[in-house]
Amino acid sequence: MKRAILLSISILFLGCFFGKAQTAQKETSPSGPDKIEAYYFHFNARCETCRAVESEAKAYILGLYPGRATFKAINLDDASSKPIADKLKISGQTLLVVRGDKQINLTNEGFMYATSNPDKLKAVIKQKVDGLLVR
């Protein structure tokens, strides 16, 4: 009986690892004119709201635009983040959606709604990103 349970748990863990690898590949490989890149810039010290902005925005953007969107959380305290922060002109915590040379800053909405009204945040993300795709 113990062997059967151990075998079942092992198979479950293997399935989790392989499933995540495939999902990660899909999330990082959109291409074409409708490609959307979402960035959440943050620092090492993060409050509950900061974490909620990242998790809610990531879930919504990748869920609303599967195969067309990427989401990257970038720590501004890491020296390796300087080139992308400079390119996008970011100096502080920011939730940014980019398509080509067009940008939408969703920082205010993210911090306003991530914990208090996540459905409103999803609606705002959809409205603004859909508008970006039409351009």
What are the language-model segments listed below?
Residues D86-G100:
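Structural micro-motif
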Residues K35-I36, P66-T70, S91-Q93:
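Loop/turn elements at helix/coil->beta-strand transitions in domains of secreted/extracellular proteins
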Residues V97-R135:
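Non-catalytic, surface beta->alpha helical segment in thiol-disulfide oxidoreductase systems
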Residues M1-K26:
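Bacterial Sec-dependent N-terminal signal peptides
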Residues S31-G63:
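Local sequence-structure signature of Cys/Sec-based thiol-disulfide redox active-site neighborhoods
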Residues P66-S81:
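Thiol-based oxidoreductase modules, predominantly thioredoxin-like and allied folds used
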Residues D34, R46-C50, E54, D78, ...:
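Solvent-exposed, acidic/flexible segments
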